[in-house]
Amino acid sequence: MELSPRAAELTNLFESRIRNFYANFQVDEIGRVVSVGDGIAQVYGLNEIQAGEMVLFANGVKGMALNLENENVGIVVFGGDTAIKEGDLVKRTGSIVDVPAGKAMLGRVVDAMGVPIDGRGALSDHEQRRVEVKAPGILERKSVHEPMQTGLKAVDSLVPIGRGQRELLIGDRQTGKTTIAIDTILNQKQINSRATSESETMYCVYVAIGQKRSTVGQLIQTLEEANALEYSILVAATASDPAPLQFLAPYSGCAMGEYFRDNGMHALIIYDDLSKQAVAYRQMSLLLRRPPGREAFPGDVFYLHSRLLERAAKRSDQTGAGSLTALPVIETQAGDVSAYIPTNVISITDGQICLETELFYRGIRPAINVGLSVSRVGSAAQLKAMKQVCGSSKLELAQYREVAAFAQFGSDLDAATQALLNRGARLTEVPKQPQYAPLPIEKQILVIYAAVNGFCDRMPLDRISQYEKAIPNSVKPELLQALKGGLTNERKMEPDAFLKERALALI
């Protein structure tokens, strides 16, 4: 029987509708909350979920799958868990946790998920990057050879840092660890102003973990006043944020820094501080019923920090020659650097800057213990001129500390010992520096050169800072520029007479 045109039209319409019926359907795997509390949700029914996958709760809060068990999945909640109830639906997103990255992030303050919290609207053009990626392999790397200047005389001369290095800042609370980190960010301002290309610019990422909101607010204000926020990104997971966000923040900040590293640029990332991240991870692990180990930390707490810090690297020329330099911060208790987390991070990093409360209260600020501080790879990146002028200073300081202990007994000292004590006292005074006042490298070289060559030996200690200010302002700009290339016999002639003359005027 032949269909009428109208019936044929209807048949075709039905066929196309049936064929396309399932085209717009999206099949989601969903589970149900079995129990929830303390930022951890146990969910039943997500059988195909991946480790580290993002999930979405019914109230819009996000979470991440950490424990994959036979029956349930242990999910950490990125936000408040008070609105999540037993029996609520949980949906898989199919994607691993990622955050925004790119130049649009510069000047912004974001949370651990990359959501802006500075009240300046949504982010403009950016890309999404996974928070957990593998560190660059051996062939993709190059040895550290470019200096990363902090603007601090004590650091740039005695424990130099190179681009792509990991240098630990370790010390008790209130010893100036954050101040060194902030000074380093501020010092990049004058380095970036001289940069002739994008590949010379240093971008900064500061990750605040478990700090007070007021402290983070002061920090933002300091960076804004110095116009340093324009080349910086701030990632804040404050003390009032849930433990999962404090755990995630360093990885999010690292992903943002890797954008610059992988695109042939240079970035500096500061984790302030990783002790609080370890405590947050311990809290999550214990709530997920993972077996505790030393100091109740889980067995993989070393891997927590090693996989993060290994992502800081200097890339080879074939892979863009970018770099990511890391300055992790660790807080010790009563100067105990042999505790679990401090020893872990010391063994992962390429050196450490040790700060001490006693030195801080004696007025030696930055309170760096030169004897315990070391930079394992930084000397290869140190400026030639700086290496030449401060070569003997570390040895002289060590001899001074040894002799100073005996000198306290007040016995008669010979002329050589007296000269050593004089020189050591001046070499201890020269590295002192006020906070948020980084010094350009060429001015540091002049000041240290004067101290090492004995021009300050007869000068009263309280006049050294005055001498320091007088030197660079009177030296010819050409000499300051030339100092960056290293000292030669010809270059030494000019500053010698001038520095001695200045010193005599202040004796």
Swiss-Prot record:
Positions of the record's site feature: Required for activity: 373
Binding-site positions, ATP: 171-178
Function of the molecule: Mitochondrial membrane ATP synthase (F(1)F(0) ATP synthase or Complex V) produces ATP from ADP in the presence of a proton gradient across the membrane which is generated by electron transport complexes of the respiratory chain. F-type ATPases consist of two structural domains, F(1) - containing the extramembraneous catalytic core, and F(0) - containing the membrane proton channel, linked together by a central stalk and a peripheral stalk. During catalysis, ATP synthesis in the catalytic domain of F(1) is coupled via a rotary mechanism of the central stalk subunits to proton translocation.
One function term, GO molecular function aspect: ATP binding
Disulphide-bridged cysteine pairs: none
Taxonomic classification: Eukaryota, Viridiplantae, Streptophyta, Embryophyta, Tracheophyta
Protein name per Swiss-Prot or TrEMBL: ATP synthase subunit alpha, mitochondrial
Known partners and oligomeric status: F-type ATPases have 2 components, CF(1) - the catalytic core - and CF(0) - the membrane proton channel. CF(1) has five subunits: alpha(3), beta(3), gamma(1), delta(1), epsilon(1). CF(0) has three main subunits: a, b and c.
Species of origin: Brassica campestris
GO cellular component, one term: mitochondrial inner membrane
Family statement drawn from the similarity comment of this UniProt entry: Belongs to the ATPase alpha/beta chains family.
Keyword set, alphabetical order: ATP synthesis, ATP-binding, CF(1), Hydrogen ion transport, Ion transport, Membrane, Mitochondrion, Mitochondrion inner membrane, Nucleotide-binding, Transport
PANTHER family: ATP SYNTHASE SUBUNIT ALPHA, MITOCHONDRIAL
Record-linked InterPro entries: ATP_synth_asu-like_sf, ATP_synth_asu_C, ATP_synth_asu_C_sf, ATP_synth_F1_a_nt-bd_dom, ATP_synth_F1_asu, ATPase_a/bsu_AS, ATPase_F1/V1/A1_a/bsu_N, ATPase_F1/V1/A1_a/bsu_N_sf
